[in-house]
């Protein structure tokens, strides 16, 4: 018998991020991770369904999905670097976080699903996957020029040289459809949502919100063609947003996440506060309050904040007052190595010396 859907989703994320040590929920983000599609797929077959088919037929796609999931966790660590829970994933505690329906878990599922879609789409455009390539020409007209070559802008007047006849889709557009399809196939469970399975509904919604953060923020890039710098013809294509931008937008959604509960039949979600409007497709959802993450707690997966570096003069989340949960902080002088005396050598290398510098750090008690 298959494990419950939420368990399969969490297990799959663990498989993607640490295939060689999934049995112990061993996490090694921050150290070199060797991608082994065979190892992932040997474990993933326990999940059954189309994931196993993808493993057998397209292991190179699975490798990109895993790369994208790790990209998502690194982005989570960047966006949460000043928070009490900083997306640390070096221990079993991360697995316990994934088993809760809290805001932080919503962000993790969204950013890893987004990373999977982003990585596969990028691999297609780079010619690294044989199953896909550039985006097919679109049916709608590309944007009109704004007077600055190479930049999209408002439509030109009818019958002018800037009319639609001079503009067409071309280049190598990023095929987000293919990336979404593979992310959805492997990151989402194919089985029907169980009755009363609110966690599955929440996690699947957050996965889709992550992919939407990639798709809805693709940008149009154009290039002019013509003699002497003229723009006799202009080709345009769709380009993925930088993943840092995807992470920033999902962080905004994290701050405005909606708490939900299930309907009586367990097949849909409603706002926990009935007076609020239902959440949209791009919103992140959660069903339980987060712990305060101040002290270590094996049950919740909280690592605590003792020993974390903080900013003694900042009033925000990175400040010692908030990050240290009122316990206070101590000063410590440490010696670090940094790049210094960097010089550019033609062509095209930047060479630096390594210098030792002493810095004063504030650390939570």
UniProtKB/Swiss-Prot annotation:
The organism sits in which domain of life?
Eukaryota
Kindly list the organism's lineage: Eukaryota, Metazoa, Chordata, Craniata, Vertebrata
What tissues has this protein been observed in?
A: Expressed in gastric cancer cell lines and gastric cancer tissues (at protein level). Detected in the apical gland region of the gastric foveolar epithelium (at protein level).
Region annotation (Disordered) ranges: 140-164
Its biological function? Ligand for members of the frizzled family of seven transmembrane receptors. Probable developmental protein. May be a signaling molecule which affects the development of discrete regions of tissues. Is likely to signal over only few cell diameters. Together with CAV1 may promote chemoresistance of gastric cancer cells to DNA-damaging anthracycline drugs through the activation of the canonical Wnt receptor signaling pathway.
Q: Which residues are glycosylated?
A: 86, 311
Principal location class? secreted
Instruction: Enumerate the PANTHER family for this protein.
Output: PROTEIN WNT-6, WNT RELATED
Can you say where in the cell this protein is located? Secreted, Extracellular space, Extracellular matrix
Q: List the disulfide bonds.
A: 76-87, 124-132, 134-172, 222-236, 224-231, 294-325, 310-320, 324-364, 340-355, 342-352, 347-348
Q: Which organism is this entry from?
A: Homo sapiens (Human)
Q: Which Pfam families does the record associate with it?
A: wnt
Show the GO cellular component annotation of the record. Answer: cell surface; endocytic vesicle membrane; endoplasmic reticulum lumen; extracellular exosome; extracellular matrix; extracellular region; extracellular space; Golgi lumen
According to the record's subunit comment, the protein's assembly and interactions are: Interacts with PORCN.
Q: What is this protein called?
A: Protein Wnt-6
Recorded GO MF terms = cytokine activity; frizzled binding
Signal peptide as annotated in the record: 1-24
| InterPro entries noted in UniProt | Wnt, Wnt6, Wnt_C, Wnt_CS
The entry sums up its family as follows: Belongs to the Wnt family.
O-palmitoleoyl serine lipidation: where? 228
GO biological process terms on file: axis specification; branching involved in ureteric bud morphogenesis; canonical Wnt signaling pathway; cell fate commitment; cellular response to retinoic acid; cornea development in camera-type eye; epithelial-mesenchymal cell signaling; nephron tubule formation
């Amino acid at each position: 018998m298959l494990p419950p859907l939420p368990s399969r989703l969490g297990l799959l994320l663990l498989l993607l991020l640490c295939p060689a040590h999934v049995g112990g929920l061993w996490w090694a983000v921050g150290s070199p991770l060797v991608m082994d599609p065979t190892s992932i797929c040997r474990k993933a077959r326990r999940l059954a369904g189309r994931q196993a088919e993808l493993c057998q037929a397209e292991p190179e796609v699975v490798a990109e999905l895993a790369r994208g999931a790790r990209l998502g966790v690194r982005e989570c660590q960047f966006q949460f670097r000043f928070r009490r829970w900083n997306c640390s994933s070096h221990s079993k505690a991360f697995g316990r976080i994934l088993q809760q329906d809290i805001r932080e878990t919503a962000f993790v599922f969204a950013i890893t699903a987004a990373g999977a879609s982003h990585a596969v789409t990028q691999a297609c455009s780079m010619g690294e996957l044989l199953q896909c390539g550039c985006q097919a020409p679109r049916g709608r007209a590309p944007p009109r020029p704004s007077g600055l070559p190479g930049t999209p802008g408002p439509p030109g007047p009818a019958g002018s040289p800037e009319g639609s006849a001079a503009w067409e889709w071309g280049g190598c557009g990023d095929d987000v459809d293919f990336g979404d399809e593979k992310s959805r196939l492997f990151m989402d469970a194919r089985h029907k949502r169980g009755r009363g399975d609110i966690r599955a509904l929440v996690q699947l919604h957050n996965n889709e919100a992550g992919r939407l953060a990639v798709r809805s923020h693709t940008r149009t890039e154009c290039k002019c063609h013509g003699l002497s710098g003229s723009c006799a013809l202009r080709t345009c294509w769709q380009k993925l947003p930088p993943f840092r931008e995807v992470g920033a937008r999902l962080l905004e959604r994290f701050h405005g996440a909606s708490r939900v509960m299930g309907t009586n039949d367990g097949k849909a979600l409603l706002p926990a506060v009935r007076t609020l409007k239902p959440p949209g497709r791009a919103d992140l959802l959660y069903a339980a309050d987060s712990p305060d993450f101040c002290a270590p707690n094996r049950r919740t997966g909280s690592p605590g904040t003792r020993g974390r570096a903080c900013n003694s003069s900042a009033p925000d989340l990175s400040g010692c007052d908030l990050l240290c949960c009122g316990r206070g902080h101590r000063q410590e002088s440490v010696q670090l190595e940094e790049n210094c005396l960097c010089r550019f050598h033609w062509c095209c290398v930047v060479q630096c010396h390594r210098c030792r510098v002493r810095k004063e750090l504030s650390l939570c008690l």
